Amino acid sequence: MGLFAFLFGRKKKDTSQALQQPAAVASHAPGTQIAYSPDLIPKLKTEHQQLLEIFGKINAAFAKNDLSLTARFLEDFRREIQSHLLTENIRFYIYLEHSLVQHMESLSLMHEFRQEMNAIGKAVLAFLNKYKDIGTRPDFALPFSRDLEDVGKILVDRIKREEETLYPLYFPVY
């Protein structure tokens, strides 16, 4: 009678332990010591939001013609984007490269994104280097305005495509 009661809803199964124990996953991508982390994608998405927030502060400071504050936010942005790119390159791309080895289409897509991100990263860092002294160089204001707008468009587009297309490829290897 206990089985029928369980099947037809008279008894509830105790799921508290099942909820507390994570599902078993392989600890590393094949051939690496890079482990799958269920927290990685939420962390990267949070970093994206932080980067966009700092970028908004750069825009706001520049709009107020506060070049000193603009320079400080540019340095904050540099620090955050370098950290983000390092995390993506080490924990995300290397893991994907090894875990997608049997999925050539997805692997090819990941390589395209990685090459594009490397180019974007270099361009953004060149932008940051070019304008690091904007706080003491008001003559930088006009070209900075145009370049800032371009970087903003590239950043927003890249984040959107990364989160919609690339991040779903990250999953545990069994």
Q: What is each stretch, according to the model?
A:
Residues 1-174:
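Small-residue-biased structural context
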